[in-house]
Amino acid sequence: MNLWVTGYRSYELGVFNSKDKKVEVIKYALQKKILEKLDEGLEWVITGAQMGIEQWTCEVVAEMKKEYPELKLAIMMPYSEFAGNWNEANQESFSIRCSLADFVGEVSKEKYKSPMQLKNYQNFMLDHTDQAMLIYDPEHEGKTKYDYEMIKKYSEQEDYSYDLVDMYQLQEFAEMYQEKDSF
C-alpha cells in the first residue's frame, strides 16, 4: 500500500522553531498513525516537501526505517526548483529531507508556471497512492484545504480512503505523549 501524507505548513501551526514541543507531538502522532498503516501493508509513504507536516513526515519515516527497513519514503514536488525561493536555512533543511528519501521526483520538470501544476500534482498523488493521511482540521483551515477537498471528492468516486487527524486527535496524541514521557 502507498500512503500520501500531507497537512499543515509549520507557520499555520505557529511553529517557527524545530525544537517547539508541538513538533514532538506531531511527530509522535505521525509515527503512531504510520505504525497502524504498516500493520495494513504499508510499503511507501509518499509526501511533498513543504515545511511542516510533510518535512516532519520525512524525519519520522527515516527514523522508523531503522526498525522497519521495508518501509520506503518518496518525496514528490509539483514542479522543478520547488525550494528555489526559500531562504538558505530552509533550502538546507529541504536538502537534508531529500537525502533521507528512497525516491525524490517532480511531477512537472518545469519551474512554477501556473496553478495547473499544483492540480497535476494532486492528481499524480491520488493516482500513485491507495490512501491518504492528513494532519488537518477543516474547522481550522490552511493551505491543505485544497488537498483535503480534492481527496474527499476523489474518495466519493473511487475506492480511496483517507484519515483525517484533526485538532481533537492531536490533543489526544499530546496527552498520550505527555503520559509516555512521565514514566
Swiss-Prot record:
Pfam families per the record? Answer: YpsA
| Domain of life assignment | Bacteria
The signal peptide annotation in the UniProt record is none
Q: Which PANTHER family match?
A: UPF0398 PROTEIN SPR0331 (PTHR38440:SF1), UPF0398 PROTEIN YPSA (PTHR38440)
The entry's family comment says: Belongs to the UPF0398 family.
What is the name attached to this protein's record?
UPF0398 protein LSL_0930
Source species of the chain: Ligilactobacillus salivarius (strain UCC118)
